[in-house]
Amino acid sequence: MSIRPRAFAILFALGAVLFTLLDSIHVHTHTLAYAHPFVFGSAWWVPLLMGCATSFGGVAYVLAWSRAGGPPRLASGVALGAALVLTAVMYAASGLMPVSSMTKLVVLTLGAAVIFFLVDGTRTGAVLMLAGAVCGPIAEAINPGFDHLAPDLMRVPMWLPALYACVTPAIGQLARKLVGSPRRSGQWYSS
């Protein structure tokens, strides 16, 4: 399988920069703490983790979309840009809002619905969003390198699945636009 290196690099850079900066909001608002902080309270590996999660997660989304028979229609660049901005706002809000975990859950769930209908709105996308909302928090729950400081269940706060539900359609649909469509043979166009 051949993946456009430029698309993969864009997704990696987006994750390594944007999501690391957003994660630093969680560090500075004492939403989470790293076991071995390196710079500004974050671990040295955070940009690598965020970059890999965004790039490999985006490619996995494209593969799953194709395998599940998702429709070929792509979101517009404007819709994707708006979804990414709203995702960043929701991520920041999850650390900055001085409210209960339940209120954060409600706000993030509403944000996830807006993002989902902005760039997707399909059954395939709903299944993938649910997969992201389940798998993301599990990955955080088993990562010993940091702790959420107000966990509700399995080392994570109750609003974390809703945050992943915000991120999944925005990054997944961006990846579909950047990576391209798989050919029938399972190969990616390299142009």
What are the roles of these predicted feature ranges?
Residues 1-191:
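Aromatic-rich, lipid-facing transmembrane alpha helices and their immediate juxtamembrane interface loops
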